Amino acid sequence: MVFLLDNTYFAIYRKLWHTDRKGIDMQTKNKTSVIANEKIDNKKLANAEKIILNLQQELKKYIKKGHGPFLAAIYDSKGNLVAKTANSVVNKTCSHNHAEMNAIKLAEKKLGTYDLSKYNLSIYVTAEPCMMCLGGIMWSGIKSVYYGVPSERVTKITGFDEGFKPNWFNEFKKRGITVYGQIEQSAGETVLKDYVANKHTIYKPTR
């Protein structure tokens, strides 16, 4: 299990999300906790904090244009931006158009390949990837994942269905994919709360 620490309580991630604490590192910073499937590298973390905070701020503009409340960016190992896209499920009427999937498609088109592994790319997302996007990331060849708001909080704030993702941190580690999560979480939660407060569409199928 992964213990999440903030200034008021300890919370335990559901077993559905993380079933094994082994191999998970945690660093408490600014009263929230960053978790990773490797020993936390402060240089990587500092870079990710800067990128994700900028994405959280930029996301507000995308929402005003009709996009969903998630933004993803893909960078190469030299820090060059390869692709950046927002969620476009509603405005493009396609359930697959999550921010991560859009960014991956754009990167593959730009680089002319379905296999991104040789480019050593990292994806930065304002929130934890859903079940579909985890599959897309894994099969694209992306090497590292950095995200903001964890799925448990996304669901609680918005009502979005993030799918089932048992022990995905360790599954990604087995495949050589680095994961850092809960980066600039507070800023990301504020954007999601504003999205809900302004009565934007919570897109999911009727059950």
Indicate where each model-derived feature is located.
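A short, polar/charged loop-to-alpha-helix boundary motif
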Residues: 90-102
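Immediate flanking context of iron-sulfur cluster ligation sites
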Residues: 117-127
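Zinc-dependent deaminase
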Residues: 9, 23-63, 129, 136-207
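Short beta-strand scaffold segments in enzyme catalytic cores
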Residues: 70-75
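Short, glycine-anchored, charge-dense loop/turn motifs used at functional sites
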Residues: 77-82
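Short beta->alpha transition motifs characteristic of CBS
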Residues: 83-89
